Amino acid sequence: MANGILVIDKSAGWTSQDVAAKLRGVFHERRVGHGGTLDPMATGVLPIFIGRATRAAEFLESAEKEYIAGLRLGTVTDTQDTSGTVLETHPVTVTRADVQAALQRFLGPIEQIPPMYSAIKIGGQKLYELARQGKEVERKPRSITIHELELLEGEGTEYVLRVRCSKGTYVRTLCHDLGSALSCGGCMSSLRRTRAGSFTLSQAVTMQQVLDFAAEHDPQELLMPVDAVFSVHPPLIVTLGQAAKLKNGAQVRDWQFRPGTYRVYAEDGEFLLLGRVENGLLTTIKSFFEVNTLAT
């Protein structure tokens, strides 16, 4: 049975669900999910969670992401990117210095109105379904954080940005809003995710590489262990006796434990759970041990 994480370098044209569906067949495993949707036109880091590792996907969805984005000024579209229908065009007279100055206005905590072409549900319907019917509904602004926003290159109408942001950020909306701030309109012309949580492009493989490898080898050799998603947290080793208690749902008290969030391992190396220590008491946030290893 396959269990682990595979970081895919998604190609343009694939939906995130397309990738997950294809890998269900490769690994013969029904439980396959991803850690944060990438639009079809976007490329780059798409962490895939397989088998028991799907229990960890929610933790990556909430992690910060990093992107390289193309900004096209002077063009406004219904999808806020170049895949959509052009609604407006405007002359562009801004300079690189103007763009650089505008970026500063979007740094830090900001409010962002989600685009109509998104999977957010309002009244039980996804926004993109309403948008395809020609309907537009009021969306409430969402609080996001732009940690870094760097102008890498560009002039005239085409610019390249590096964006490090919180969960829930729509980079195409950021491009649209930048265009509005510059009074010429704008949209996203390209998007490449370079990091999701602790996962980077250096760890990623393409779907074709996966398929080629699986044709001659066991594809499970490509998988990273589930605890890789928690690498930002320090490890905590517990005795086999303490591990048995944790597996049976109990808390474990040890005054040598320091406060914090930990990757918890049994002393034999088995990854047990993500846990939190307060006042010497270790409690489970999410468990990942195999059910057939439960202590009796």
List the predicted regions and their residue ranges.
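Accessory RNA 3′-end/elbow-binding domains used by RNA modification enzymes
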Residues: M1-D9, Q17-A42, A97, A181-T296
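Catalytic cores of RNA-modifying enzymes
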Residues: M1-K167, V171-A204
